[in-house]
A protein has these predicted regions:
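ATP-binding glycine-rich phosphate-binding loop
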Residues: 36-51
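ATP-binding pocket architecture of kinase catalytic cores
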Residues: 51-60, 64-177, 181
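Active-site activation/catalytic loop segments of kinase-like enzymes and analogous catalytic loops
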Residues: 180-190, 251-288, 301-310
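An alpha-helical support segment within catalytic cores of ATP-dependent transferases
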Residues: 21, 25-31, 156-168, 173, ...
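Protein kinase-like catalytic core scaffold
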Residues: 74, 102, 116, 220, ...
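Short secondary-structure junctions
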Residues: 27-36, 99-101
């Protein structure tokens, strides 16, 4: 686009303004609405920003391939423009959609401005749905576990050299980096309680052993942040978002992320039931028995590593 994406008072924290948005939506999406509405959305912990763009008048809206009128969409604003069409988010998005896995459609990418125009998958995350309909908690989590097994099965066995996830993994070095990051930024900085050299050495030895055990596991495609805030609940289906850091790792990694979620409390009995359900689906999908003792051990070790990393 030739229109400068200059922000104005109506678009706080955006690198674009009303003129840019009006011209872009008309040229790319054929929107004819007199008034375009833009609201900033609550994002994740990253430097990305999110905006919902909609029009009040839906006459003459653009039709996508499925002939569904696009009445609203999401703009994902990168921390800063990256002059590359194939950023990790887009490569992984294309890969997931090629496997018929639920991920938002990418309509347009303004490379110079670092703005991605994405399908609007609604306002309800799995977390929202769980709190709104607590009576459906078991059914909703079973749905999330089913999607996880489907994602792991399809993505693990469909290796694509263009997908960045296959070029990175949870090895000992990566797992220990996350552990040391927690020590430096949580224990030392946030708690202001730096460990002495001896205590840090002892703790490091314990975690090295734990990380070596985890790293021996068979590698699966992992979302890396598969939890209730990164699953949108859109018209009865769950949709994957925030998957740009996907990598190879133990199958338990995403299951721990889901069932040991810091945003939603799950009763221990339901956790056990869902682990059993996951193992049953996994055995059915792969056609072989799971070593349950080993599986549970890695699940527990992964729970320690994952939750310390997340503090």
């Amino acid at each position: 686009m030739a229109i400068p994406a200059t922000s104005d008072n109506n678009f706080p924290k955006a690198r674009f303004g009303s003129l840019y948005l009006s011209v872009t939506m008309k040229k790319i999406f054929k929107w004819s609405a007199f008034e375009i509405h833009c609201e900033k959305l609550q994002g994740d912990a990253s430097e990305r920003s999110y905006f919902r763009v909609s029009q009040k008048n839906t006459e003459g809206v653009h039709q996508n391939k499925a002939q569904k009128s696009i009445q609203s969409l999401i703009i994902m604003q990168l921390e800063k423009p990256i002059l590359d069409m194939e950023i990790d988010f887009i490569q992984i998005l294309k890969f997931l959609r090629s496997l018929d896995l639920p991920a938002p459609e990418l309509f347009y990418y303004d490379i110079p401005q670092g703005l991605l125009f994405l399908e609007d998958c609604g306002t309800m995350t799995l977390e929202n749905q769980l709190y709104s309909f607590p009576q459906d908690k078991t059914l909703l989590y079973r749905q999330a576990v089913e999607l996880l097994v489907r994602m792991q099965s399809k993505a693990t066995h469909s290796v694509d050299s263009t997908c960045p996830a296959y070029n990175r993994k949870f090895d000992v070095q990566k797992l220990m980096w996350e552990f040391n990051f927690m020590l430096d930024h949580y224990v030392d900085d946030f708690c202001n309680s730096p460990l002495d050299g001896f205590a840090k050495k002892e703790l490091s030895e314990v975690f090295t052993h734990l990380c070596e055990s985890i790293a021996k596991e068979k590698l699966y495609f992992t979302h890396r942040d598969y939890h209730s805030r990164n699953l949108m609940f859109d018209r009865g289906r769950l949709v994957l978002i925030d998957f740009q850091d996907a990598r190879m790792g133990p199958c338990q990694y995403d299951l721990v992320s889901l069932l040991k979620d810091s945003y939603v409390k799950i009763d221990d009995a339901l956790v056990v039931e869902l682990i059993d359900f996951y193992v049953w689906l996994k055995e059915k999908e792969e056609g072989q028995k799971v070593d349950r003792e080993r599986f549970d051990l890695i699940f527990d070790e992964m729970s320690i590593q994952r939750n310390l990393k997340a503090v």
